[in-house]
Amino acid sequence: MSEELYIAGSCNIGTREIMRRRIVALSGLIFALITASAVLSADSPKSARWAVFVPLLVAAIGWIQSRRKFCLAYGLAGTFNFGRMGEIKRVNDPISRNADRKTALTILLQSLALAFVLTLVFYFLPI
């Protein structure tokens, strides 16, 4: 296994944290599918299809974080973790913290966009 290393604005979580983000992504996707199924089977009004947005957002955030090896919350808080869960360390360099915040906001915007597009697709499905 390669050595895990904090890289400002690029990598702030290790293998365990990445696995945790994958679990969050899968959980969000499962909840989105359950929500979509419930909305469709209950013969709800079309506007109820927007209910999948939040679980899709959770899935998108988890998935993008796992792919980028970067935790949005840690980036905003100026922290990182490559050890056990809860062994969070502070980023001391202000330039690195700024780079982390920019990456965190980028991940948030990407996640919002992905969840919105997927929700729109579901909304306009002719079923």
Regions found by a protein language model. Name each.
Residues S2-I127:
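Membrane-interfacial helix-loop segments of redox and metal-homeostasis proteins
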